[in-house]
């Protein structure tokens, strides 16, 4: 059975999840990288997406930040850097598939995890089956999802699948809430496969998934693929699921916080770790291109009562640097793919050169 590698332009296809990922009944391995459109200027989207394709990958993944698209209650914005439709079209024109993670909570080291601040003025419990919260999500989805459903794969677009919530198993275990989010999506025309993503540990998988409702389960980790996939496989076996394995967030770097050392990861070690994932399943590199937390949208972690704000840069020590150019990590992973997965065609990446003045970039 010949594998499908890339999106065939202008041709509708069917994506299914069985014992493996299948496109039109042919086996498909997802090689995805995260590029958040809201962290990259629109004039640079093509550059970043092209470099993802040039690496040998076939899919782009992105979150959608509710607090940017509905900054005030009932006031919506899908223009400029928030034009998700234009972003997806750019990806499709390059032959890339897309994985969409459409809120309500995204984490992503983003202000309030993507939740709009005006929710705090409402009498509701966020990320729960509270009717007031679900109504707010429903109103947002009424505006958002009609922009996405025409771009589903079986409607001629490039969206393979969409996520329900985000790492909910690290927060709560309100299954009624997860089912309600799924229902809101399906009632508004989302017909593609749905999935959840959580840490691959028993407690988080039990709390954050809808495995008994046949919602596909993915895991998030940055190393030890053998161990983490084994944990997921055990969970699948317990629930009678014969699904493919996928790491939805393979952390190839890490975010940085004020007054803390910049975190770096060895390129060759990363390339080997990516190879170990691909030997068993599919991957989404988080991040492929981190970009920038524009304005005051950088998030904040906490350690006890101590706030640990992230910096403006979301470079993440990713495969592309903050401005979108290839790093040593990019070339190390590309060499690994060329050696072990030559069936995925590669190209020379684009590099943007800056003017120089007395040794400083302008």
Residue ranges and their predicted role:
Residues 45-111, 182-186:
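Aromatic-lined substrate-binding rim segments of carbohydrate-active enzymes
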Residues 177-274:
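Noncatalytic carbohydrate-binding groove/subsite architecture in carbohydrate-active enzymes
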């Amino acid at each position: 059975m010949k594998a499908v590698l890339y999106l065939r332009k202008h041709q509708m296809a069917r994506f299914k999840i069985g014992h493996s990922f299948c496109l039109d009944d042919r086996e498909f391995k997802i090689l995805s990288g995260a590029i958040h459109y809201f962290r990259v200027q629109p004039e640079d989207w093509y550059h970043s997406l092209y470099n993802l394709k040039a690496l040998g990958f076939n899919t782009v993944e992105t979150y959608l930040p509710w607090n940017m698209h509905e900054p005030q209650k009932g006031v919506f914005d899908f223009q400029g850097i928030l034009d998700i439709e234009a972003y997806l079209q750019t990806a499709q024109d390059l032959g890339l598939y897309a994985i969409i993670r459409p809120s309500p909570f995204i984490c992503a080291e983003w202000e309030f995890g993507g939740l709009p601040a005006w929710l705090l003025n409402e009498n509701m419990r966020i990320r729960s089956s509270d009717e007031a919260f679900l109504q707010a999500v429903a109103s947002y989805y009424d505006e958002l999802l009609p922009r996405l459903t025409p771009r589903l794969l079986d409607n001629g677009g490039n969206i393979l699948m969409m996520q329900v919530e985000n790492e909910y198993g690290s927060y709560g275990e309100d299954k009624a809430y997860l089912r309600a989010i799924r229902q809101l999506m399906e009632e508004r025309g989302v017909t593609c496969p749905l999935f959840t993503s959580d840490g691959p540990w028993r407690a988080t998988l039990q709390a954050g998934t809808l495995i008994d409702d046949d919602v596909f389960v993915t895991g998030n980790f940055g190393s030890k693929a053998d161990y983490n996939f084994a944990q997921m496989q055990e969970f699948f076996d317990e629930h009678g699921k014969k699904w493919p394995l996928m790491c939805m967030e393979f952390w190839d770097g890490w975010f940085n916080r004020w007054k803390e050392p910049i975190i770096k990861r060895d390129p060759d070690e990363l390339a080997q770790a990516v190879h170990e994932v691909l030997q068993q399943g599919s991957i989404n590199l988080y991040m492929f291109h981190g970009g920038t937390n524009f304005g005051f949208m950088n998030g904040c972690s906490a350690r006890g009562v101590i706030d640990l704000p992230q910096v403006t840069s979301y470079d993440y020590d990713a495969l592309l640097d903050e401005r979108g150019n290839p790093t040593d990590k990019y070339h190390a992973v590309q060499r690994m793919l060329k050696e072990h997965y030559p069936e995925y065609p590669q190209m020379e990446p684009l590099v943007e050169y800056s003017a120089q003045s007395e040794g400083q970039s302008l």
